[in-house]
Amino acid sequence: MREYAIEFIGAMFLVLAIALTGNPLAIGIMLMAMVYMGGHISGAHYNPAVTLAVWMRGKLKSNKLFGYMISQVLGAFAAALIAYVLIGKAFAPSPGIGVAAWQSILVEILFTFALCSVILAVATSKKLEGNYIYGLAIGFTLAVGAFAGGSISGGAYNPAVAIGPMIFKSFLGAQNWNNLIIYLIGPFAGGILAALAFRYLNEK
């Protein structure tokens, strides 16, 4: 249960940073801090796409896979609720105006691939065991992804960032679910590709 609690807390603060600031650097720093906070307990995924990649890597037991993902979505939902209480606005990611769905999906695939690849390398590779750079590397990867792709796809790179807030917005009667497919296909495809690439390029 400690692992699930950490995943809930980390996802909550990550999404809260997204909802309240929208600032890529602040979001990256928050992720970095949460990685250092919970890495030794849960692995600090805070992202179902990362959880899937780590599971494919063999570093997460199958009986914890969905528990992690549910905890992350619940944390994101809680963040959306808190943000609404604080600023009176319901948050959910969305693509830029005039951006085609395939463009958004491609951006989500690319930068989720980058994020998951970095996580698998710095947090699961034997050659980098015991390093203290992992949080910094992970946080800055997300920040760069948010700077680069935020105006295209919304820069989620994390299904929970979309699912939790979209569920909350649906309670307000304000949610359009059309964009959800972008934040499912893109991040999960990116995570799967990262795990496959890591398996091919690195030691088991």
Predicted regions and their residues:
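Membrane-interface helix-loop junctions and terminal tails of multi-pass membrane proteins
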Residues: 1-204
